[in-house]
């Protein structure tokens, strides 16, 4: 249960960090435009088919120093894969420790040590066999 929660939190953090990065735009020739999403490609195709000029608004965000996309992408993937490997290895250790505690068996003074419950519970049937009810 907690492993699933950790994975969901990790995915949420990764999604928000990816959405927080500005979209890198490539400077192309004067006649060409950079299309960053498929919806923009469809919009541009529709406007060209109708014969209307497509006007693109520029964002008012300040220009940041842009690293080469390949280096930035490679570094972030390496960091994320390293983080994920550490998280998985730490979770495997705790799962193994917990599973060995259960695989050792029950102590002799445990309440159901004399019964044949091997990983399943049979609620009601054994208690009904032990007691006779008057009809």
Curated annotation (Swiss-Prot):
<dbReference type="GO" id="GO:0005184">
    <property type="term" value="F:neuropeptide hormone activity"/>
</dbReference>
<keyword id="KW-0732">Signal</keyword>
<keyword id="KW-0765">Sulfation</keyword>
<dbReference type="InterPro" id="IPR015499">
    <property type="entry name" value="CCK-like"/>
</dbReference>
<dbReference type="InterPro" id="IPR001651">
    <property type="entry name" value="Gastrin/CCK"/>
</dbReference>
<comment type="similarity">
    <text>Belongs to the gastrin/cholecystokinin family.</text>
</comment>
<dbReference type="Pfam" id="PF00918">
    <property type="entry name" value="Gastrin"/>
</dbReference>
<keyword id="KW-0027">Amidation</keyword>
<keyword id="KW-0372">Hormone</keyword>
<dbReference type="InterPro" id="IPR013152">
    <property type="entry name" value="Gastrin/cholecystokinin_CS"/>
</dbReference>
<keyword id="KW-0165">Cleavage on pair of basic residues</keyword>
<comment type="function">
    <text>This peptide hormone induces gall bladder contraction and the release of pancreatic enzymes in the gut. Its function in the brain is not clear.</text>
</comment>
<feature type="signal peptide">
    <location>
        <begin position="1"/>
        <end position="20"/>
    </location>
</feature>
<feature type="modified residue" description="Sulfotyrosine">
    <location>
        <position position="117"/>
    </location>
</feature>
<feature type="modified residue" description="Sulfotyrosine">
    <location>
        <position position="131"/>
    </location>
</feature>
<feature type="modified residue" description="Phenylalanine amide">
    <location>
        <position position="123"/>
    </location>
</feature>
<protein>
    <recommendedName>
        <fullName>Cholecystokinin</fullName>
    </recommendedName>
</protein>
<feature type="modified residue" description="Sulfotyrosine">
    <location>
        <position position="133"/>
    </location>
</feature>
<keyword id="KW-0964">Secreted</keyword>
<dbReference type="GO" id="GO:0030424">
    <property type="term" value="C:axon"/>
</dbReference>
<dbReference type="GO" id="GO:0007586">
    <property type="term" value="P:digestion"/>
</dbReference>
<dbReference type="GO" id="GO:0005615">
    <property type="term" value="C:extracellular space"/>
</dbReference>
<feature type="region of interest" description="Disordered">
    <location>
        <begin position="26"/>
        <end position="75"/>
    </location>
</feature>
<feature type="compositionally biased region" description="Basic and acidic residues">
    <location>
        <begin position="45"/>
        <end position="55"/>
    </location>
</feature>
């Amino acid at each position: 249960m907690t492993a699933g929660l950790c994975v969901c939190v990790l995915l949420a953090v990764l999604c928000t960090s990816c959405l927080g990065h500005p979209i890198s735009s490539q400077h192309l020739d004067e006649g060409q435009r950079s299309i960053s999403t498929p919806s923009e490609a469809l919009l541009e195709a529709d406007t060209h088919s109708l014969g209307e000029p497509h006007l693109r608004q520029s964002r008012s965000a300040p220009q940041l120093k842009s690293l080469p996309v390949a280096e930035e992408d490679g570094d972030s993937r390496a960091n994320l894969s390293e983080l994920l490997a550490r998280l998985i290895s730490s979770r495997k250790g705790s799962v193994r420790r917990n599973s060995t505690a259960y695989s050792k068996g029950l102590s002799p003074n445990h309440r159901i040590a004399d019964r044949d419950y091997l990983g399943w519970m049979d609620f009601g049937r054994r208690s009904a066999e032990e007691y006779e009810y008057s009809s």
